[in-house]
Regions:
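Gram-negative outer-membrane beta-barrel transporters
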Residues: 328, 531-694
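Surface-exposed extracellular loop regions of Gram-negative outer-membrane beta-barrel proteins
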Residues: 22-29, 33, 156-170, 178-179, 275-279, 284, 336-338, 391-392, ...
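Repeated loop/turn-to-beta-strand initiation elements of outer-membrane beta-barrel proteins
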Residues: 24-26, 66-69, 204-207, 264-267, ...
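A beta-strand signature from Gram-negative outer-membrane beta-barrel systems
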Residues: 1-29
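C-terminal beta-signal and adjacent terminal beta-strands/loops
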Residues: 536-537, 620-623, 683-696, 721-797
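Outer-membrane beta-barrel signature, preferentially recognizing the C-terminal barrel domain
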Residues: 190, 386-397, 457-528, 535, ...
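Outer-membrane beta-barrel transmembrane domain signature of Gram-negative proteins
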Residues: 235-237, 241-256, 261, 273-275, ...
Length: 797
């Protein structure tokens, strides 16, 4: 039920009423659990994802007039999970093998060059390779001959460019499992303290406050950098490395308010402050352009957000008809978003002399390369730090006023309406309204309906977030995934202006909903049904990744169009970007759905009963109307279709419409047997569609419109609780007791995929990324951690 007319931005689909603890006494819970699954630890079995959590709560009275103070603390430590398969692609090439032998003899081959075609040590490198290659015992005679006959580095590059993974793994005493990614939930340690307090000052006035502080330290992983990849400096990591992304997250919030009465009105004056900061540290990594001089840990920067709201609210009941409730008030909101840059080496690309690359890029003869001449990427591998051009400190404010009325026309008929006006400093005004009615048709049957308009202001993060990260795209020649530096440009950047991205404006909604509740008291049965329809215009999307304009594209134009493309090249180069994405008001959507909840309770005898809850929902969102394409010189002419496809690609459409289950249902049965209770819950998650393209019909080919579909699954949870006495309760249970996993990624890779609206073919992408993503990394019905077993002790005194 939309509530933007009452509460403002983000309440398009309603709000949640959170009741904070205010009880007295001491209570807590200690819980331990983990994923006991056949697929734990990369399908080795056992247990992973262990969680140990302690919750404590204490409440006491405050003053002598009914005040209270309640505080809650939580400490938790969660281990990571991983569900990666055994890597099945190339890991080592022949150069890696020769490099290993040379290293065993005290020679670091890769330290002898920065740029393989621009090094004074070419003869030395050639001689070392010819000296140590014969010691690689598994090279064939033909391979040894090719190496021995090579008289130049280019000839050696050709002679050493073949896969030796299986033999080299054996020589190094390793297995393919040693090169697995970590695919699953991250490691997490957290501590939280929150409070809720109220202090009556007199009979009509009370002071209240609530808030808290939390800290979370996360440890997740990026893609494994293999030793045969250009992003790996084998001088530092001879077997490649798995970058770790460490996060430090602080959240702080506090509210202070005063309630009283004035001229018959209940008055609430309050201020709320909330902050969040997210710092990144990248460990077990390297800046490949620094070679052996690279650190292994980087401060990659920080993002932070602050919001302060100040509210004055009035409400009063009037003796009109069967009762009129009038509420009105005002709000002032201030928001601030910051990005702090990381250390230089976390984002910079260096040349072979250790100088930072200019905005125009590194000259070919000065670029740092691997042995085969591939340019090495800059910045900390796994997560590139925020750059100086990413740094931002932006704020905005808004003023709002609202009125909300509810009139009981008769004892069985209520009508209500609300109107809210807001003025934002960055995009202007918005006015939203709501009408609703509730009819008590019979004592046990209620019908309601509502219609409302709403909005969602573009967040400061959507407007000003800027970052460059490593993403993987299919090589149009080899079909293999290769890293590209992708930049998110701000909405107000020069790059966005050149592409034609307009300034962000609010999303606007119109919605209607209706529903009924029906009770049969004699049968302890209640039924609730709700249906809804929401239309959202100007929905904010993240565009696909645009490629940097090539010199050929620039030279094919003239005049203003050519200058625009040159300026766009400069914008890319200033951020070391090869691809770029933008936030834009790009589409309109419609969402329709229905929710059904049926609750029943049956009492067998004193202390023995069963309560059953059946809930089901169907929800479908789809894009409607035309794309809101920017009109610029860049998207004109024959490239228009391709430009539109990049603006909102097929994968984004699937994410929007089919990436979450349309149908969900659950049946919970809670059997109470005196001090013992048993909970059995069955949940069904409907099918989902992966945005990746693959050969679904097994004809050997695929198109960008051909996607795998993962079928619906039934998940069963069970728990048994025992109330030992009034102070102690014990619970054991298992979520997903059947250890049910989603359907696996397709294992066959088609010959090619038609990857454009014109169905131009190119080599296909392996959706499993060499068997690392056994399950989809793009969609999730219910998670991929399998069975979770736990035990919990609850206590109160």
């Amino acid at each position: 039920d939309g509530s933007a007319a009452q509460y403002g931005s983000d309440a398009i689909a309603g709000v949640i009423n959170v009741n904070l603890k205010r009880n007295s006494g001491f209570s807590g819970a200690l819980q331990y659990g983990g994923n006991v699954s056949n697929a734990s630890n990369n399908f080795s079995g056992g247990i992973d994802g262990q969680l140990l959590q302690l919750d404590l709560n204490y409440g006491t009275s405050l003053g002598k007039k009914g005040g209270f103070f309640n505080i809650t603390g939580t400490l938790a430590n969660r281990e990571n999970t991983s569900r990666a398969g055994i890597r099945n692609n190339s890991i080592f090439n022949a150069y890696n093998a020769v490099e290993r032998i040379a290293g065993n003899n005290g020679v670091n081959l890769s330290s002898l060059f920065g740029n393989i075609t621009n090094t004074p040590n070419q003869s030395q490198i050639i001689n070392y390779i010819k000296q140590y290659a014969p010691q690689v015992g598994y090279f064939t005679t033909a391979q040894q001959t090719a190496i021995a006959n090579a008289s130049s580095l280019s000839a050696l590059q050709s002679a050493l460019n073949f896969d030796v993974t299986n033999n080299e793994l054996s020589a190094r005493g390793l297995s393919r499992k040693d090169f697995n990614m970590n695919v699953g939930q991250s490691k997490l340690a957290t501590g939280q303290v929150y409070y809720n307090a109220k202090l009556p000052l007199n009979e009509i006035t009370s002071l209240y406050s609530f808030g808290g502080l939390s800290y979370r330290k996360g440890d997740s992983y990026a893609f494994y950098r293999l030793p045969n990849g250009s992003g790996t400096s084998t001088s530092l990591y001879s077997n490649g490395f798995l970058p770790e992304i460490e996060s430090d997250i602080y959240d702080f919030s506090t509210a202070l308010g005063l309630t009283s009465k004035l001229a018959g009105f209940d008055v609430d004056l309050s201020t709320n402050l909330g902050t969040n900061s997210f710092s990144y540290t990248i460990n077990n990594t390297a800046n490949a352009t620094l070679g052996v001089n690279s650190p292994s840990s980087f401060n990659a920067g920080k993002i932070a957000f602050l919001q302060n709201t100040n509210n004055l609210d009035f409400s009063r009941n009037f003796d009109v008809l069967e009762g009129l409730n009038l509420a009105f008030g005002a709000e002032y909101r201030y928001e601030n978003f910051k990005i702090n840059k990381g250390e230089e080496a976390s984002y910079a690309i260096y040349d072979i002399n250790g100088n930072i690359a200019p905005a125009t890029g590194v000259a070919t003869n000065l670029a740092v390369t691997d042995f085969f001449g591939n340019r090495r990427g800059g910045g900390s591998q796994g997560f590139t730090g925020f750059q100086p051009l990413d740094e931002i400190n932006k704020s905005r404010n808004s003023f709002a006023g609202y009125v909300d009325t509810e009139l009981n026309i008769f004892n069985n008929w209520i009508v209500s309406g609300a109107l809210r006006y807001e003025n934002y400093s960055d995009f202007g005004n918005t006015l939203n309204g709501k009408l609703a009615t509730l009819v008590k048709v019979t004592p046990n049957f209620n019908w309601r309906a509502s219609a409302q308009t709403g909005f969602r202001a573009p967040s400061l993060q959507q407007k000003y977030f800027s970052s460059t990260s490593t993403q993987f795209f299919t090589n149009s020649t080899t079909g293999l995934l290769e890293p590209k530096q992708v930049t998110f440009f701000t909405n107000e950047s020069r790059a966005a202006e050149l592409v034609g991205i307009p300034r962000l404006k609010p999303e606007k909604s119109k919605s209607i909903s209706t529903g009924f509740t029906f009770k049969i008291p004699s049968a302890n049965l209640s039924i609730a049904v709700d249906g809804y329809f929401t239309r959202i215009n100007d929905r904010v999307i993240l565009t696909g990744a645009y490629a940097r304009p090539t010199d050929a594209q620039v030279n094919a134009t003239s005049g203003a169009a050519q200058q625009a493309l040159k300026d766009l090249q400069s914008a890319f180069d200033s951020k070391y970007a090869e691809r770029a994405s933008f936030f834009s008001n790009g589409i309109n959507t419609e969402t329709k759905g229905i929710d059904v909840v049926i609750t029943h309770k049956h009492n067998f005898s004193e202390g023995i009963s069963i309560k059953s809850d059946l809930a089901g929902s169907y929800n479908h969102t789809q894009r409607v109307g035309k794309l809101q394409l920017p009109q610029t010189l860049i998207n004109s002419g024959s490239n228009a279709a391709s430009y539109a496809f990049t603006f909102f690609p097929e994968s984004s459409k699937v994410y929007l419409e089919n990436a979450i289950p349309r149908f969900k249902a659950s049946l919970s049965n809670n059997l109470s047997l005196g001090k013992l209770d048993i909970l059995l819950r069955n949940s069904y998650f409907g099918k989902v569609t992966d945005p990746g393209a693959t050969d679904v019909n097994l004809d050997g080919f695929s198109s960008v419109y051909e996607h795998p579909v993962y079928g619906g699954k039934l998940i069963t949870d069970i728990s048994i609780g025992y109330q030992y006495n009034k102070n102690l309760r014990f619970t054991v249970g298992a979520n997903n007791v059947g250890d049910v996993y989603p359907d696996t990624n397709p294992t066959t890779v088609p010959a090619f995929t038609n990857t454009s609206p014109g169905l131009t073919s190119s080599p296909s992408t392996d959706l499993s990324n060499a068997n690392q993503f056994v399950y989809s990394r793009a969609v999730s019905q219910y998670g991929l951690n399998g069975r979770y077993v736990f035990a919990r002790i609850n206590f109160n005194f």
